[in-house]
Amino acid sequence: MPRRREVPKREILPDPKFGNVEVAKFMNVLMLDGKKSVAERIVYGAFDQIEKKAGKAPIEVFTLAIGNIKPVVEVKSRRVGGANYQVPVEVRPSRRLALAMRWLREAAKKRSEKSMALRLAGELLEASEGRGGAMKKRDEVHRMAEANKAFSHFRF
């Protein structure tokens, strides 16, 4: 990590179809080996499926799902006097989005549908309704933070 100056955040250009920066960011999270066109095909395919299945605007479903998955608190290990404590800390906004997208990707990968586009569509629809694997992960993280509330005075 450089000590001299803070490295500026790279600006991510909005995606071509919806003009949304979050969708473009999610495509980057989904992308493997620099194959952006494959990631685009998966995301847009999932959005088409959402429109077919739910009849809702896919961008609204995506925004709602990401909003539901975003964690508010998480736990970080802190060593105090020879013991490790799981200390609950608030998650900064940029990390909230990154975690939500990562959890969404992993939950979609674990589903049983045939194509990744179908899995992603299913996971997005469930997350927008407050269900699904990504929501389960968020609730698990929140439960851990709640259980370790007693150690919050060890904050960094």
Curated annotation (Swiss-Prot):
PROSITE patterns in the cross-refs: RIBOSOMAL_S7
Gene3D superfamilies with a match to the protein in the record: Ribosomal protein S7 domain
Signal peptide range: none
Protein name: Small ribosomal subunit protein uS7
Domain of life: Bacteria
InterPro entries: Ribosomal_uS7, Ribosomal_uS7_bac/org-type, Ribosomal_uS7_CS, Ribosomal_uS7_dom, Ribosomal_uS7_dom_sf
Gene: rpsG
Residue pairs linked by disulfide bridges in the UniProt entry: none
UniProt entry keywords in alphabetical sequence: Ribonucleoprotein, Ribosomal protein, RNA-binding, rRNA-binding, tRNA-binding
Subunit structure: Part of the 30S ribosomal subunit. Contacts proteins S9 and S11.
GO cellular component terms, semicolon-separated: small ribosomal subunit
Gene Ontology BP, a term: translation
Record function comment: One of the primary rRNA binding proteins, it binds directly to 16S rRNA where it nucleates assembly of the head domain of the 30S subunit. Is located at the subunit interface close to the decoding center, probably blocks exit of the E-site tRNA.
Family to which this protein belongs: Belongs to the universal ribosomal protein uS7 family.
Any GO molecular function: rRNA binding
